Amino acid sequence: MQKTLLICCGATAREVLAIVKGNGMGHMQVESLPAGLHNTPQFIPERGREKIRANRDQFERILVLYSDCGTGGRLQAVLDEEGVEGLGGAHCYEMYAGAAAFASITDEEIGCFFLTDYLTRHFERLVIQGLGLDRHPELRDSYFGNYK
């Protein structure tokens, strides 16, 4: 089996590790980028590139378990330049349901908010503080007014 590095978001690392361990995929190693990058997606592509380049010589294959995640196509450009595969799609949360089911869910109800275990555990830091709601609570409805 090819020694494979899986680069994922810190928000999905627990689930990815569970899949790897639960299926005896000892040839795969999981590393993650900080989940807080979702609040600053412009930094995801270069942080991904850094992780790829830092590990390229140690692995036969590298997979990046990110979708676009707000990078405006810049992450895919980095993956193409580095010759690495990613998940594709708009949101990494698509991997939980699959692209077709995710599209169906979000098409049916555009006001979906996907609350994962990670986001629940770190809600204060990632959402309240990360989006500045602790300093500007009046922004709550602007951020979340369209969710149901």
Show which residues each predicted segment covers.
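N-terminal basic/disordered segments at the start of proteins
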Residues: 1-24
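Short hydrophobic beta-strand segments
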Residues: 3-8, 112-117, 148
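A short beta-strand-loop structural module common to alpha/beta enzyme folds
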Residues: 26-44
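Glycine-rich, highly charged phosphate/nucleotide-binding loops
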Residues: 41-54
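Short glycine-rich phosphate-binding loop at a beta-alpha junction
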Residues: 61-66
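Long, charge-dense
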Residues: 74-128
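Active-site glycine-rich loop that binds ribose-phosphate moieties when present
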Residues: 126-141
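Conserved anion/nucleotide-ligand pocket segment
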Residues: 141-148
